[in-house]
């Protein structure tokens, strides 16, 4: 299995700090998100970037990855044992030696009982939009084959067509019975576990079953009220901005959050007041008229008060 260069994927250096990596991640997430990008490999690139961020954003996982990367070209000595003369031997050699010393009966007596196969976990990236309905997904993974010493001798590529149910959440585990490694001596197969990773979205943040989206509004829209078009996971809606709205105010849109078997969350629009560019002479005069009309208003009146 090839070890990916996550730093190259993110376009950063191994010495870069988390802030630099986070900036690169946000830029690439916006660039390759399927809702925005027109590049044919956008979805694959987006998932690759999300995978890299998942590792590099965690201090412990990043340290472990750096150590693995440093030793990626080291010989895999753990797959073989060495005789005194330096020649390697495998499990069959070990059995032959055991039989020659203790006899065939002893060899048969050391046969292990039936044992269940190993479970396998793989991470599956899912877009927020995909959580709304059940969808099919083709997944590929490597099925390890163990030798008599419990060590991996080879990996067999395997592909499955699976159903991802509606309402899956981040970190949720889906069990595919019997799709793990084969059991030993007639034992049952292990299972395959799909661990759901909800890919970060350029517009929405997840808060439990709810979603949050930052909605930019002009000062006059906040002051006078307005109707603005806001995207949701399914379609765009017309959101009413009440007169006198404040920056950071949260407006609830019922039933437009995440869907699960038990409930449907809401969408919260968080208002962000955006000032226009530096005013020209006429615009500045209008702002001054507003300031004169509201001369008694002090936005810092309660500043610092409990």
UniProtKB/Swiss-Prot annotation:
What is the protein named?
Curved DNA-binding protein
Under InterPro entries, the record lists: DNA-bd_curved-DNA (IPR023859), DnaJ_C (IPR002939), DnaJ_domain (IPR001623), DnaJ_domain_CS (IPR018253), HSP40/DnaJ_pept-bd (IPR008971), J_dom_sf (IPR036869)
Q: Where is the J domain?
A: 5-69
A Gene Ontology molecular function term for this protein is: unfolded protein binding
Primary role = DNA-binding protein that preferentially recognizes a curved DNA sequence. It is probably a functional analog of DnaJ; displays overlapping activities with DnaJ, but functions under different conditions, probably acting as a molecular chaperone in an adaptive response to environmental stresses other than heat shock. Lacks autonomous chaperone activity; binds native substrates and targets them for recognition by DnaK. Its activity is inhibited by the binding of CbpM.
Q: Which organism is it from?
A: Escherichia coli O157:H7
Location, primary (coarse class): cytoplasm
Q: Where in the cell is it found?
A: Cytoplasm, Nucleoid
List the GO cellular component terms. cytoplasm; nucleoid
Output the GO biological process annotations, alphabetical, semicolon-separated.
chaperone cofactor-dependent protein refolding; protein refolding
Q: Which Pfam families match?
A: DnaJ, DnaJ_C
Gene that specifies this protein: cbpA
Q: Which UniProt keywords apply?
A: Chaperone, Cytoplasm, DNA-binding
């Amino acid at each position: 299995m090839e070890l990916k260069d996550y730093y190259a994927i993110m376009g950063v250096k191994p010495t870069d700090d988390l802030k630099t990596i986070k900036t690169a991640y946000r830029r690439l997430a916006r660039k390759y998100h399927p809702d925005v990008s027109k590049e044919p490999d956008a979805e694959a690139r987006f998932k690759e970037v999300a995978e890299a961020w998942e590792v590099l954003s965690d201090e412990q996982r990043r340290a472990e990855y750096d150590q693995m990367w440093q030793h990626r070209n080291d010989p895999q000595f753990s797959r073989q044992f060495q005789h005194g003369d330096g020649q390697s031997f495998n499990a069959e050699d070990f059995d032959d030696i055991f039989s020659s010393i203790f006899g065939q009966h002893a060899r048969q007596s050391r046969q292990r009982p039936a044992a269940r196969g190993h479970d396998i976990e793989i991470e599956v990236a899912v877009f927020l939009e995909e959580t709304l309905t059940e969808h099919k997904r083709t997944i590929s993974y490597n099925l390890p084959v163990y030798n008599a010493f419990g060590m991996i001798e080879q990996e067999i590529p395997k592909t499955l067509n699976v159903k991802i149910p509606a309402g899956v959440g981040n970190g949720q585990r889906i069990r595919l019975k019997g799709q793990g490694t084969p059991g030993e001596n007639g034992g049952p197969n292990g299972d395959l576990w799909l661990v759901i990773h909800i890919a970060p979205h350029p517009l929405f943040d997840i808060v439990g079953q709810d979603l949050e989206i930052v909605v930019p509004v002009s000062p006059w829209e906040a002051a006078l009220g307005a109707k603005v078009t806001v995207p949701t996971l399914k379609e765009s809606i017309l959101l009413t901005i009440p007169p006198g709205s404040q920056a950071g105010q949260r407006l609830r849109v019922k039933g437009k959050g995440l869907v699960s078997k038990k409930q449907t969350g809401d969408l919260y629009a968080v208002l962000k007041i955006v000032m226009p560019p530096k005013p020209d002479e006429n615009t500045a005069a209008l702002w001054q008229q507003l300031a004169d009309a509201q001369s008694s208003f002090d936005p810092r009146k309660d500043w610092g008060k409990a």
